[in-house]
């Protein structure tokens, strides 16, 4: 069994990892081959690259400077922005500046359910209903209305 020397958590655009910050400095201090990681990450996330999603990744670095990485599902906020039409390649919108007072978009319960199903593997929620409530809470704090 290899000895783990570090674990790095990053959020990178799908299919667009490059040696520039934050990837280069984070991996460089652990002695990892940066280009090798970029190639592997970009190959693994090629399918999501068209959707311009941010993919969280956990990189485990071993004593012999080898590494493994685990991809997570995109953050709920990114998926909600996409569903509400706030997140596109051209327009990278943010949530409301005053959540609770102003609304920047809306999503249907069906879209919330779809996002919850996508996020279930990375959530600690015990059921789909609980996951949906979590996603609805995220939407509320972003100023996105849930309708239907």
Swiss-Prot record:
One of its GO terms (cellular component) is cytosolic large ribosomal subunit. GO terms for molecular function: large ribosomal subunit rRNA binding; structural constituent of ribosome. Pfam families: Ribosomal_L11, Ribosomal_L11_N. InterPro entries: Ribosomal_uL11, Ribosomal_uL11_bac-typ, Ribosomal_uL11_C, Ribosomal_uL11_C_sf, Ribosomal_uL11_CS, Ribosomal_uL11_N, Ribosomal_uL11_N_sf. Residues 89-108 are annotated as: Disordered. Keywords: Methylation, Ribonucleoprotein, Ribosomal protein, RNA-binding, rRNA-binding. Gene3D superfamilies: Ribosomal protein L11, C-terminal domain, Ribosomal protein L11/L12, N-terminal domain. Part of the ribosomal stalk of the 50S ribosomal subunit. Interacts with L10 and the large rRNA to form the base of the stalk. L10 forms an elongated spine to which L12 dimers bind in a sequential fashion forming a multimeric L10(L12)X complex. Forms part of the ribosomal stalk which helps the ribosome interact with GTP-bound translation factors. This is Large ribosomal subunit protein uL11.
């Amino acid at each position: 069994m290899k000895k783990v020397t570090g674990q790095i958590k990053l959020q990178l655009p799908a299919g667009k990892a490059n040696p520039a910050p934050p990837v280069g400095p984070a991996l460089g201090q652990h002695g990892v081959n940066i280009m090798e990681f970029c190639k592997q990450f970009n190959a693994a996330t090629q399918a999501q690259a068209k959707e311009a999603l941010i993919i969280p990744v956990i990189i485990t670095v071993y004593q012999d400077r080898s590494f493994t990485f685990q991809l997570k599902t995109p953050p709920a906020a990114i998926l909600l922005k996409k569903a509400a039409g706030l997140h596109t390649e051209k327009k990278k919108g943010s949530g409301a500046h005053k959540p609770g007072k102003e609304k920047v978009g809306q999503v249907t319960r069906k879209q919330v359910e779809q996002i919850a199903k996508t996020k279930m593997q990375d959530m600690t929620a015990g059921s789909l209903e609980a996951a949906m409530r979590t996603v609805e809470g995220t939407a509320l704090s972003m100023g996105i209305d849930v309708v239907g």
